[in-house]
Amino acid sequence: RSTLVELLEGAPGEQVQQPVRSAVDDVKRQFGLGDHHLRLAKAGRKLYVEVDFVVPEDYVVRDEDTVRHNLLARLEQLPHDVWLSVEFTADPTWGD
């Protein structure tokens, strides 16, 4: 069953999702980010993590890179090959 879910790019199990959600929430608090939308998919050892953060309009690219590096450092501790994509937007409709 879990192999079929992975092939269909379904959400991974709770034991995979929980540490990712915790890492995203920690980074969100640390950097004062707004709402976010998190998408996860798992295929074998590869874990695809996509996060969209809502940020203030004056947010700068240098800050975005710092957030990405910090989040990746946390996720690399997981027993998966993490493929991370982090997006930033000032439009709150993208954070839903």
What are these regions (language model features)?
Residues 1-96:
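Alpha-helical transmembrane segments and adjacent TM-loop junctions that form the membrane-embedded core
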